[in-house]
């Protein structure tokens, strides 16, 4: 029975989320806090599954990891979300109206089609942003996320604030979409991302693993060597990796970077400044040597 439950719990959870947003009262849909609460409850539910069917003892959630990860979850859903809205979504929406851009075809599409379109739109953009972060100076913003030394349902929110802002950007505001469909898509993506980071032993149907990112695929992305991380970039929709040739089968048990050094919150925040700080320190050393 337990094996059956953990085989189907991922697709069933996604189905329940979609059903919730289909029947949710208009007053709930109009309140942006509904998606925050729904996503938080989804992550909490998935996190609780670790106590029933743990995947790796070495990834077991302890008090320090819990409070650290909770801090990032709150940061991402409040401060970062607000910044994305004010600095990206609202200006993009204003530009859309100023240019007279309309997409009636999306607005009049069936609810589930709007959800699927929004999921793909967000994930495809995140895929390329994530991939760029592994191939350019942007690695300094993303590397802190790879310094995590264990995985759990909340780990998807852990990272440098600049990275969290960048990966939250999308062009959804350019399209006319039902608000409930957008919130549903965000809730679905949170669920899949939480499943993909969870320390839970799942055995999903093959069709689920074909479309959605699993803990196996994502743990491989968190391998300890930099070159090993350059695959399976999709946070939730692994189909993007399959389409773009970056998918790789496998699983990792040992995760982390730089000899698995765990970063504190302060170290996560200042990590992108390391090259600048190193340069300043080197110049200070040169000046001191010259003064002698």
Show which residues each predicted segment covers.
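A membrane-cytosol interface segment of integral membrane proteins
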Residues: 255-292
């Amino acid at each position: 029975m337990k094996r059956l439950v953990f085989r189907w719990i991922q697709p069933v959870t996604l189905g329940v989320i979609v059903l919730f947003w289909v029947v949710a009262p208009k007053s709930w849909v109009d309140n942006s806090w509904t998606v925050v609460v729904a996503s938080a409850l989804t992550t909490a539910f998935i996190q609780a599954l670790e106590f029933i069917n743990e995947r790796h003892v070495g990834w077991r959630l302890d008090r320090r990891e819990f409070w650290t990860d909770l801090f990032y979850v709150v940061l991402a859903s409040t401060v970062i979300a607000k910044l994305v809205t004010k600095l990206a979504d609202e200006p993009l929406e204003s530009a859309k109206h100023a240019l007279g851009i309309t997409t009636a075809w999306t607005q009049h599409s069936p609810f589930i089609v709007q959800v699927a379109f929004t999921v793909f739109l967000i994930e495809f953009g995140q895929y390329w942003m994530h991939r760029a972060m592994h191939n350019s100076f942007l690695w300094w913003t993303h590397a802190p996320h790879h310094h995590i030394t264990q995985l759990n349902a909340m780990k998807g929110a852990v990272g440098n604030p600049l990275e969290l802002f960048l990966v939250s950007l999308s062009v959804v505001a350019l399209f006319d979409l039902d608000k409930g469909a957008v919130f549903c898509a965000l809730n679905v993506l949170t669920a899949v991302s939480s499943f993909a980071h969870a320390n839970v032993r799942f055995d999903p149907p093959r069709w689920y693993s074909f479309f959605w990112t699993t803990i196996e695929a994502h743990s491989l992305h968190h391998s300890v060597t930099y070159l090993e991380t350059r695959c399976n970039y999709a946070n939730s929709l692994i189909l993007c990796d399959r389409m773009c040739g970056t998918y790789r089968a496998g699983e990792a048990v040992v995760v982390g970077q730089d000899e698995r050094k765990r970063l504190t919150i302060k170290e996560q925040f200042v990590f992108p400044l390391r090259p600048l700080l190193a340069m300043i320190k080197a110049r200070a050393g040169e000046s001191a040597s010259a003064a002698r």
